[in-house]
Swiss-Prot record:
Modified residues (3-methylthioaspartic acid): D89
Alphabetized InterPro entries for the sequence: NA-bd_OB-fold, Ribosomal_uS12, Ribosomal_uS12_bac
Coiled-coil positions: none
Origin: domain of life: Bacteria
Name the record gives this protein: Small ribosomal subunit protein uS12
Function description: With S4 and S5 plays an important role in translational accuracy. Interacts with and stabilizes bases of the 16S rRNA that are involved in tRNA selection in the A site and with the mRNA backbone. Located at the interface of the 30S and 50S subunits, it traverses the body of the 30S subunit contacting proteins on the other side and probably holding the rRNA structure together. The combined cluster of proteins S8, S12 and S17 appears to hold together the shoulder and platform of the 30S subunit.
Organism the protein comes from: Aeromonas hydrophila subsp. hydrophila (strain ATCC 7966 / DSM 30187 / BCRC 13018 / CCUG 14551 / JCM 1027 / KCTC 2358 / NCIMB 9240 / NCTC 8049)
UniProt-listed SUPFAM superfamilies: Nucleic acid-binding proteins
Keywords recorded for this protein, A-Z: Methylation, Ribonucleoprotein, Ribosomal protein, RNA-binding, rRNA-binding, tRNA-binding
PANTHER family recorded: 30S RIBOSOMAL PROTEIN S12 FAMILY MEMBER
Pfam families: Ribosom_S12_S23
UniProt GO cellular component terms: small ribosomal subunit
Length: 124
């Protein structure tokens, strides 16, 4: 235990927590415009063509965002909503596009986990 005199001379340092999603600036989501929509390949043990897009956010940041689900309607100049959440096998991809918001349509014919892919409840 440090004495009061020691603490006066050298105070306890606060732990600085670094954000995993700095471009969001402590917001839950941010809006942006797609500057490039393309596919990329994942890291070593995995193999696929992952759909990603480069997004210029309203705060000026340019980030890479993953497009989840099967099939999408995004192209250059599409307005999308970005949330945090990295993709483990894609280096540098720390954001996800929100399906079913703004210009990004929900996943077609999705029956399970619909809320994650912006799909309304089907008519029974």
């Amino acid at each position: 235990m440090a004495t009061i005199n020691q603490l006066v001379r050298k105070p306890r340092i606060k732990l600085v927590v670094k954000s995993n999603v700095p471009a969001l600036e402590a917001c839950p989501q941010k809006r942006g415009v797609c500057t490039r929509v393309y596919t990329t390949t994942p890291k070593k043990p995995n193999s696929a063509l992952r759909k990603v897009c480069r997004v210029r956010l309203t705060n000026g940041f340019e980030v890479t965002s993953y497009i989840g689900g099967e099939g999408h309607n995004l192209q250059e100049h599409s307005v999308v909503l970005i949330r945090g959440g990295r993709v483990k096998d894609l280096p540098g991809v720390r954001y996800h596009t929100v399906r079913g918001a703004l210009d990004c349509a929900g996943v077609k014919d999705r029956k399970q986990a619909r809320s994650k892919y912006g799909v309304k409840r089907p008519k029974a």
